[in-house]
Amino acid sequence: MHAHKTISILAIVSTLLGGALAETMTDQQRAEQILTSAGVKGGLIVHLGCGDGQLTAALRAADSYLVHGLDADAADIAEARKHIMSIGQYGGISVERWSADTLPYIDNTVNLIVCEMPDIAESEMMRVLVPNGVACIRSSDGWTKKTKPRPSRMDEWTHYLHSPNGNAVSRDELVDHLSRMQWVGGPRYGRHHDHMSSASAMVSAAGRLFYIFDHASPFSIQLPSKWQLVARDAFNGTVLWRREVGPWFSQMQRLKSGPSNLPRRLVAIDDTVYVTLAWRAPLTALNAATGETKKTYEGTNGTDEILYSDGTLFLVVNREGHSREPFTEWTRQERTIMALDADTGDISWERTWPWVIPGGMAVDHSRVVFYDGERIAALDRKTGEPLWRSEKMGRRSPVPVYFSPCLVLYDNKVLFSGSDPDTSSYHADNGKTMYALSAESGESLWRQPHAPSGYRSAEDILVINDLVWTADIFNSRDLRTDQTGTVWGRDPKTGEVKVQFKPDVDTHWFHHRCYRAKATTNYLLTSRTGIEFVDFRKEHWTCHHWVRGACLYGIMPANGLVYA
């Protein structure tokens, strides 16, 4: 789903391909030269002026490419189509007659344009190219390569909660109200509403999208799962590669939400994907362009959570193996926090702790901070030595597997909510208390009420524009409770309320969907029904009831888009 907004474009003229594409070269050689020069690895290629289709077909160097040829000459299109069908490639390669001066693609769709049609304006090519997309343009003077820059106001989403500090806020200023679809990828449905969510994790880096999904048939939840890690182009959805995942968590998990640490098992940084390819597997690094294994990290079997910061991987490892009671709650078992070099795999340090509650770890420039089920603790980032341990913090007891606390590191402060115990099981998702500590000493700075967050999911704390945002969105009047939807913005230094407002729209509210809220620097993104864009400056709610995220994971704002 694309948030419609104009993106300013500057084409960058690069080196000439020149005589390397001489007429003496075969179409296969020309295609290899173009792909090498462009540096495009997978995605949608458009050949303008495709002629007889020989070069068009050669441009599909692997299954990770889709190729579309355009030409104004009907006879050439017929010849090209005949050739492509003769080699059994029609579908992955297709051609179409086209004579207009506008291209038949929405903005930010095409990875590579090979242009041999002089009537197409360069500005039109830049419009349809994805950020960092390339146009190779042929003229009487030879070939010119031009690259569309990635807008500085666009952001990635590399971790479950955006970054290792735990603040699920994108810096993407291009994400705006939803107005159209950018692309749709299957499968169309998750497997079951009342069992394990089919979506476990999703991240995005370097113009690619990665997610873990159960592709087994929805006909019966009792059929075996087919978990896969899938890589797609983030702007057009082209499938780049797939890797099998499993054995994974049981699809028979009750009430859809699944273990809350599953989304934390996938991280993407530049051209590398860090993931566990099974429930009890070690950490593996994959080539983001091809899916090939780059490294398997020794000593990391049982990795439950992954964070990456400045070349170092920080892991929560469960070596015992038994992390939960059947389907219901997390067990209190030893966990090992580990730091290792992302390139070499060398372990810098490791420290075993009586418990590290799932979802309760974050990292900043100086320290690793986590919740051990009773107190928040900090370790030195470089050595793993303990720095401090806080006073006791309230939490749910027992801790159900769908739940995790929220811990955010911001401006030398630790913000935390662990969802205090509640005597009513129906209201057990209520947050109740939010704490702020000094990240340097662990000293308590303030505590304030914390309203219920997502239904059967983790807690919400979002820091935007130097305010700490929470909202009373867990449930609705129709479901035995009376959550008002009130939004609060607090001073991170004192906890004082600086902004407070209720929804200004009169609509049906369901319970918040079974995942936590996220945000951008312009909007809180809640899901009391579909996806609500809450403009905290204008104190205005805009509802998009036609789309929502899957249980457990939710939605992801990145690349000027919202993925759901």
Q: What is each stretch, according to the model?
A:
Residues 40-58, 64-68:
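Conserved class I S-adenosyl-L-methionine
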Residues 80-81:
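Conserved SAM-binding loop
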Residues 38, 94-95, 148, 152-201, ...:
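Aromatic (tryptophan-biased) beta-strands that constitute blades/sheets of beta-rich domains
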Residues 101-112:
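A short acidic, Gly/Pro-enriched loop at the edge of an enzyme's catalytic core
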Residues 194-229, 254-283, 297, 301-338, ...:
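Repeat-blade elements of multi-bladed beta-propeller folds
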Residues 25-44, 54:
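Conserved alpha-helix/loop element of class I SAM-dependent methyltransferases that forms part
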Residues 88-100:
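Conserved SAM-binding strand-loop segment of SAM-dependent methyltransferases
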